[in-house]
């Protein structure tokens, strides 16, 4: 009877191959990880490397892991593939709304940045770099808040915890990551005086109508740049916000129309004056189309375009905005503050928080109140002061 090889035993040999007439050399180790219980045949695995030393180190590590019972067979599964499996098969006890939020974060953040990495190769340093990058301000987009990054971390941590339980990876690399401290950022809206100066400064500017619509609708930059004419209903006086302009997560990535951050389209009813601004934009675009002639191309039917019908570049819009606000003494103002300006103006005009939440596309009214609660507090104080004056007037009569 032949003697069985012990699990973990292996041999190293030098291998060569020829490609395009040139000979290449590498080292290979084959080792046993045990026997198939069904067939009784030996299960063989292979390790390769550029040098004998590299392969020998890998073989020793695999042998130790086999002896200790911690060995995990190499897998070609990527992080993206595992996230898809996990989100479809391991969230049966999670509310549908939460599952939807998980899938949105996976699609918008985790897969574009980590999806192509082999699951077993994902490490703490890579994940930490990903978290840090999410919190950095870029020219064409706002940084994610510390709270949002923490939520994304929670999803990844949970998915990788299951991968450990399934035996796909030895440990959860998110465990050692350092999350940013959640600091509530002050909003910097344009006040009434700033708004008047801003509107005066953009008169005749190429982006005048774009800036004006953003200021008085509260649309995010990606939403206003991704707005299409089929979503503008002049008869009803409404705007359907269902898309946003995004760039592929790679160097010089192409721009495309994507679904919203929360995958929830919303209908906004702006002031009639804003709809008139959009009519002006339609006329301006028609003039641009005539001037461009055969060079015109607007396949997505975008509302705001360059002179040839193409999409506007987000960082160009932001840079030009910064030049405008600097000229009126507000160099600290960001493009996103146009959204804050709309929200504050709406609340002070008497809109309730629920209405403002719906127009802004926030997930909950509590989030809207958390961001703009100080405005309602100021209004309450002003109301109390008016009532105080009224009471004193009555008592002194």
Question: What are the roles of these predicted feature ranges?
Answer:
Residues 1-77, 81-89, 103-104, 129-132, ...:
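Basic/aromatic DNA-contact patch characteristic of tyrosine site-specific recombinases
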Residues 2, 200, 236, 247-249, ...:
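C-terminal secondary-structure termini that scaffold catalytic or DNA-interacting sites
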Residues 19-24, 72-76, 87-168, 184-186, ...:
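N-terminal core-binding DNA-recognition domain of tyrosine site-specific recombinases/integrases
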Residues 45, 52, 238-240, 258-280, ...:
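C-terminal catalytic core of Y-nucleophile DNA break-rejoin enzymes
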Residues 138-142, 200-207, 217, 268, ...:
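Short, basic (Lys/Arg/His-rich) helix/loop patches that form interaction surfaces
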Residues 142-146, 150-152, 165, 169-229, ...:
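Basic, Lys/Arg- and aromatic-enriched nucleic-acid-binding interface segment
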Residues 181, 185, 189, 245, ...:
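Catalytic-site neighborhood detector that most strongly recognizes the C-terminal catalytic loop/helix
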Residues 231-238, 331-332, 351-373, 381:
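Short, polar N-cap/turn motifs at the start of nucleic acid-interacting alpha helices
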């Amino acid at each position: 009877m032949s003697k069985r090889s012990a699990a973990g035993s292996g041999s190293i040999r030098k291998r060569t191959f020829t490609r395009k007439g040139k000979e290449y050399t590498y080292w290979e180790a084959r080792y046993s990880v045990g026997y198939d219980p069904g067939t009784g045949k030996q299960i063989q695995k292979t390790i390769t490397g550029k040098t004998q030393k590299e392969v020998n180190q890998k073989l020793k590590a695999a042998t130790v892991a086999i002896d200790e019972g911690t060995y995990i067979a190499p897998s070609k599964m990527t992080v993206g593939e595992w996230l898809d499996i996990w989100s479809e098969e391991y969230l049966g006890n999670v509310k549908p709304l939460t599952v939807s939020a998980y899938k949105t974060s996976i699609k918008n953040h985790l897969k574009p940045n980590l999806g192509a990495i082999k699951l077993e190769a994902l490490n703490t340093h890579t994940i930490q770099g990903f978290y840090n990058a999410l919190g950095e301000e870029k020219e064409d987009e706002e940084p994610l808040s510390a709270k949002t990054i923490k939520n994304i971390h929670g999803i990844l941590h949970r998915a990788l915890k299951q991968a450990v339980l399934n035996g796909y990876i030895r440990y959860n690399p998110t465990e050692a990551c350092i999350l940013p401290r959640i600091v509530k950022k002050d909003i910097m809206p344009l006040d009434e005086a700033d708004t008047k100066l801003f509107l005066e400064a953009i008169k005749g500017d190429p982006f005048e109508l774009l800036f004006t619509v953003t200021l008085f609708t509260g649309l995010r930059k990606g939403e206003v740049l991704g707005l299409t004419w089929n979503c503008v209903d002049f008869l009803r006086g409404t705007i359907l916000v269902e898309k946003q302009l995004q760039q592929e997560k790679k160097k010089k990535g192409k721009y495309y129309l994507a679904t919203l951050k929360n995958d929830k389209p919303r209908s906004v009813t702006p002031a009639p004056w804003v709809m008139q601004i959009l009519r002006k934009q339609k006329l301006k675009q028609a003039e641009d189309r005539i001037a461009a002639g055969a060079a015109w191309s607007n396949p997505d039917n975008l509302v705001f375009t360059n002179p040839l019908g193409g999409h506007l570049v987000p960082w160009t819009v932001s840079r030009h905005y910064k030049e405008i606000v600097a000229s009126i003494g507000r160099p600290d103002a960001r493009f996103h503050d146009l959204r804050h300006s709309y929200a504050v103006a709406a609340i002070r005009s008497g809109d309730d928080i629920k209405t403002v939440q719906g127009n802004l596309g926030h997930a909950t009214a509590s989030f809207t109140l958390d961001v703009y609660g100080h405005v309602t507090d100021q209004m309450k104080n002003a109301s109390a002061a008016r009532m105080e004056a009224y009471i004193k007037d009555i008592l002194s009569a």
